[in-house]
C-alpha cells in the first residue's frame, strides 16, 4: 500500500521567520500597538495569526483581523520571500519521491502564499498535494487542514494489519496534536520554532534534530512494516 507523508511548511521545510516577524512588526507599528519581545514573537510562528494577535496582544477579534490584513500587505509582496529552505530538505523530498510516497504540504499559512513559496524555491514538483489555510472559507486550523490533505492524498491510513501508513512532520504542537488525533505517525522537528519540551508535551512519537534524522525515522518505520 502506498504511504503518505505530510509536511508543515514554516519551520519544517523553510525558515520563514524573518519575513513573518518583520511583517507582524510592520502591522503592529502601523496601528500603534506595542510590539512584543522576541521570545513572545516566536509564539506567532505556527498558529493562525488572528488567534495569535488576540492571545499575545490582547486584541479583540475585529482588531486582530484588521491587523492581520495589514500584515498581508507586506508579507504578500516582500515577506514571503524573506525565507530559505532548510539544509537537506531537497534530498529528503527526493528520497520520498523515489520511495513512492504521496507527498503533501499541510500548512496553516494561506494556500496561495504556500504555493508562491514552493514555486520560488522550485519545490512544487515534489508535492502531489498542497493544502493551506483559506481565511475566506474558514479553513484555518491544523486538524482541518490536515484532514483535507489526507483526503486529497487518497491513501489508506493503515494497512490490513493495522500498521499506520501516514506521517506528519512539523515543528509545533499544532502539527503533532493534529497528527495524533487523526491517526498519523507524528514526527516533531526541533530545528524549527517549537521547543523540544512543547513537542514532547504534545506526544510527538519521534523527535528529529535535523532533516537527516527524518529520513532515518522513515527508514526505521519501513523496516518495522516489513517485519
Regions found by a protein language model. Give the residues of each.
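Conserved Rossmann-like nucleotide-cofactor binding loop
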Residues: 12, 19, 111, 174, ...
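Short beta->alpha linker loops
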Residues: 44, 48, 84-88, 109, ...
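Short helix-capping segments at alpha-helix termini
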Residues: 29-34, 60-62, 98-99, 122-126, ...
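N-terminal helical cap/lid subdomain that shapes the substrate entry/recognition surface
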Residues: 2-90
Amino acid at each position: 500500500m502506498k504511504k503518505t507523508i505530510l509536511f508543515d511548511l514554516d519551520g519544517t521545510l523553510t525558515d520563514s521567520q524573518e519575513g513573518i516577524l518583520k511583517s507582524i512588526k510592520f502591522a503592529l507599528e502601523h496601528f500603534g500597538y506595542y510590539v512584543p519581545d522576541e521570545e513572545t514573537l516566536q509564539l506567532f510562528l505556527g498558529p493562525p495569526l488572528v488567534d495569535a494577535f488576540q492571545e499575545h496582544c490582547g486584541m479583540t477579534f475585529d482588531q486582530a483581523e484588521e491587523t492581520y490584513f495589514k500584515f498581508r500587505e507586506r508579507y504578500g509582496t516582500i515577506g514571503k520571500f524573506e525565507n530559505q529552505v532548510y539544509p537537506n530538505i531537497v534530498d529528503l523530498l527526493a528520497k520520498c519521491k523515489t520511495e513512492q510516497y504521496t507527498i503533501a504540504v499541510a500548512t496553516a499559512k494561506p494556500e496561495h502564499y504556500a504555493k508562491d513559496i514552493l514555486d520560488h524555491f522550485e519545490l512544487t514538483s515534489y508535492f502531489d498535494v498542497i493544502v493551506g489555510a483559506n481565511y475566506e472559507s474558514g479553513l484555518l486550523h491544523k486538524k482541518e487542514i490536515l484532514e483535507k490533505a489526507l483526503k486529497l492524498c487518497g491513501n489508506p491510513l493503515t494497512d490490513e494489519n493495522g500498521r499506520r501508513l501516514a506521517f506528519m512532520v512539523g515543528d509545533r504542537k499544532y502539527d503533532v496534536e493534529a497528527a495524533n488525533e487523526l491517526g498519523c505517525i507524528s514526527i516533531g522537528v526541533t530545528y524549527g520554532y517549537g521547543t523540544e519540551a512543547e513537542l514532547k508535551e504534545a506526544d510527538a512519537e519521534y523527535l528529529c534534530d535535523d532533516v537527516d534524522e527524518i529520513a532515518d525515522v522513515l527508514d526505521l518505520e519501513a523496516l518495522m512494516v516489513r517485519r
